[in-house]
Each structure stands twice: as C-alpha cells, then as structure tokens.
Amino acid sequence: QDNLSLLDIGTGSGAIAISLKHARPGWQVAASDLSDDALAVATENAHRHNTNIQFFQADVFRQVSGKYDIIVSNPPYISFEDKEEVGTNVLTSEPHLALFAQEDGYAIYRQIIQGAEEYLTENGKLYFEIGYKQGPMLQEMIGHYFPQKRVRVLKDLFGLDRKVVVDNG
C-alpha cells in the first residue's frame, strides 16, 4: 500500500526510516529517539537523502500521538552481561545508550510491546531487530500482549534469529 503510516522508535542515525521512506515515498514516516545527538545525525542524513521524515525526541511512546500502520524498532538490546561479546570497534564507535538495555536486553522491547496496542491501527504490524538469543523470549512476551496476532522470528544469513514480525497472519 502506498499511504501507510510508520513510526521508527529509537531511530539512531535514521537509516531504517530513511530507507523505508525512499522505498515507499507515499508513506508518512515519523521517527523518534531519546538522544538529541542521534536526532541531529538522523535529520542531517534525511536532508542529505531528500526525505521528508518527522523526527522528534521521545522515550519510547512518550510524546507519540496518533495511530500507525507499522511500528519498527532496532532498540538497544544487548545485555550488560554480554558486553564482552561486543567488538571493541563497536564499543568505541557507538554510544552505549544505543547498544545496551536493562532486563538482560529486553527493557526497551518490553516498553514497546506493552504500549504498542494503543498506537497501532487495527491491522498494524510490529517489526523488531533482535539479538540472536532473544527470539523465544520475545515470541512469548509478544504472544502474551498480542494473543490474536501472529508472531514470527526470522533468521539472518547465518541462520541466527535476527528479526521479529508481528502481524495478523
């Protein structure tokens, strides 16, 4: 469809929002982040790529209004206990706010999942990037809050869990 609305939570550099807006120019795309610095980078990137995206500062759903057909998020999902698994180049080049989350990496997912129903349209979909060990737990968590929805865990090219899709099936 060409007239969908999308919210990217935790947009960071804006890569997901910008790519989707390029692929679907008719979509209304909004993107939020907690970090002012990230939003400045995202806004500059959107300007460079001639995309019209509404950027705003928000902590998950605070400051969000309206309903969206699609909510996407690549939130911080690394457990602080798994810090040693993260490459040194990532640790030195990425803000830790963008990498690590409380509750063994599930804190931001939980906030999004608990609040998403209020901001999704009736046929709305959720898309998450996930850590390779998080598929089963997220499937269970999402199933609790969205028993009527289909929850799929998709694998990356290495056969590891990498994305969750929540839809009506």
Question: Could you tell me what each predicted segment is?
Answer:
Residues 1-73, 78-85:
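Conserved SAM/SAH cofactor-binding pocket of Class I
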Residues 16, 42, 74, 90, ...:
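Residue-level signal for inorganic ion chemistry
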Residues 54-56, 97, 152:
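Structural signal for short hydrophobic segments within the conserved structured cores
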Residues 61, 66, 157-159, 169:
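Short, solvent-exposed coil/turn elements at secondary-structure transition points
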Residues 74, 93, 129:
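Alpha/beta-hydrolase-fold catalytic nucleophile elbow
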Residues 77-108:
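Mobile active-site "lid"/loop adjacent to the S-adenosyl-L-methionine
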Residues 81, 168-169:
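Short loop segments at secondary-structure junctions
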Residues 103-167:
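Conserved Class I SAM-dependent methyltransferase catalytic core
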